[in-house]
Regions:
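Structural and coupling elements of P-loop NTPases
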Residues: 1-72, 78-250, 257-321, 335, ...
Length: 458
């Protein structure tokens, strides 16, 4: 991808208080951009976990790649971020839908780190709420461009003028506030136009060594650890040297179809482990295999790793060699020399310092969340302890906000002391352990940490 092609990418997330209409707005965006056919549409499409759909809340962040053609611009214009907006150009919109409940706020903070913009949704009947302010502050700390949106204007008890006043008091101009009905699709096209016109394009370097931020992950029995990544610099190509069709890039960049060297090995900077990617691709919203991920794009990397501890959220992925280029710089280099044996087992290098001394600076990671509620989980069957340990490790891969450590009780035997961000978080984790891993667990009463102040040294 040429550096100029970055101007056609927008990375943004939707944030709001719980039940203010984030998922409904995401549904309308998917529908209006043609990402999902009408026959396949259903409410809360990005909430793929059955628990999310049953409870009516978003628990885990969900990325999706959309395309949108800007037709309401005549000629060429520039926005306040000096983005060049071109008439009839096709833009790649990478959306990350986020939870609204405070117990899953860590998911929001990880999403924001992968974006340049945020759509802040406020319910017209409720106005600004606690998580509205919390998410707004998180977005501002990340220096994101924020698009204020008032949702549910179709309801008879909507107080649009009042909510506009509340948003104005938070520093937004009245003319930039968009009033919509995500349910009916009213004015949602204005949100799409604002995303293209207001949110800045990624500012990564296509010629720099590969740097990709892991903002989430999951475990697949066949593909191993699947990392959700935002490519900040450089590019990654999976498979042998190929010529990529210009149609993959919306602008048909003539240089985009040039031969590409395979990244024979990727490296996780924090753990030092090296892998050959089994598969890379986009979220459409289901995983769709592609031939590569370019600078500024959001997608996934199937690593083949079976040890979930080696791929941590917040880590930086780079090429094992920092001299990777998307075009062959040495014409004498053969495809055979570029192809390496696929590895699916962990590879901790003995000479890690030498291999990471490639002048690639790791991206800022994430601050570990502090658990607020604690409880013990013990298997009903004492011989299932190892299964519980494996399940907790795999579950933590997709929910890094909870922690666990082994404990032993005279009455209950061996188990795990687990920390959560709240009671709802604890309930969801226990339900996932039961449904996804078939575990029968005994949970102790929830507790919180106490701070003890000793007086007179007694």
């Amino acid at each position: 991808m040429e550096q100029s092609s970055l101007k056609f990418i927008r990375n943004f997330c939707i944030v709001a208080h719980v039940d203010h209409g984030k998922s409904t707005l995401a549904d309308r965006l998917l529908e209006m951009t043609g990402t999902v056919q009408m026959r396949d549409m259903r409410s809360q499409l990005l909430d793929s976990n059955p628990i999310e759909r049953e409870r009516g809340i978003t628990i885990k962040l969900a990325p999706v790649r959309m395309t949108y053609r800007m037709n309401n611009v005549q000629g060429t214009m520039y926005n306040e971020n000096q983005n060049e907006i071109i008439h009839s150009s096709l833009y790649i919109l990478n959306l990350i839908d986020t939870p609204g409940h405070v117990d899953f706020n860590y998911e929001v903070s990880r999403s924001l780190a992968a974006c340049e913009g945020a759509v802040l949704v406020v319910d017209a009947t409720q106005g600004v709420q606690a998580q509205t302010l919390a998410n707004l502050n998180l977005a501002r700390k990340q220096n994101l461009t924020i698009i204020p949106v008032i949702n549910k204007i179709d309801l008879p008890n909507a107080q649009i003028a009042k909510v506009i006043g509340e948003l104005s008091s938070l520093g937004f101009r009245k003319e930039e506030i968009i009033a919509i009905s995500a349910k009916n699709g009213t004015n949602v096209d204005q949100v799409l136009e604002a995303i293209v016109s207001v949110v800045p394009a990624p500012n990564g370097s296509t010629s720099s060594p590969l740097r990709a931020l892991i903002f989430s992950s999951q475990y697949d029995p066949h593909k191993g650890v699947v990392c959700y990544v935002r490519v900040v610099d450089g590019s990654i190509i999976a498979g042998p040297a190929v010529s990529i069709s210009p149609q993959i890039h919306p602008q048909g960049d003539p240089g985009f179809g040039a031969p590409r060297a395979r990244v024979t090995r990727l490296q996780f900077i924090a753990s030092g482990v090296e892998v050959d990617p089994i598969e890379v691709g986009y979220f459409m919203p289901k995983m769709l295999k592609s031939r590569g991920l370019e600078t500024g794009e959001v997608g996934y990397i199937a690593t083949g790793l079976k040890d979930v501890a080696l791929a941590k959220v917040g880590d930086t992925i780079t090429a094992q060699s920092s001299v990777f280029s998307s075009r062959f710089s040495d014409k004498s280099l053969s495809v055979g020399q570029l192809t390496g044996k696929q590895k699916t087992e962990k590879q901790i290098s003995d000479n890690r310092e030498q291999k990471t001394d490639n002048r690639v600076i790791p991206l800022p990671g994430y601050k570990e969340p502090k658990p607020m509620v604690f409880l013990g989980l013990f298997p009903i069957e004492s011989d299932k302890v190892s299964e519980v340990r494996d399940a907790l490790g795999k579950l933590r891969l997709s929910d890094s906000a909870f922690s666990y450590k082994p404990i032993s009780s005279l009455a209950l035997g061996h188990g795990f002391h687990c920390g959560f961000l709240g009671l709802l978080h604890a309930e969801v984790v226990q339900e996932r352990l039961s449904r996804e891993f078939g575990l029968n667990l005994l949970a102790t009463a929830p507790t919180v940490e106490y701070k003890i102040k000793i007086k007179n040294q007694r």
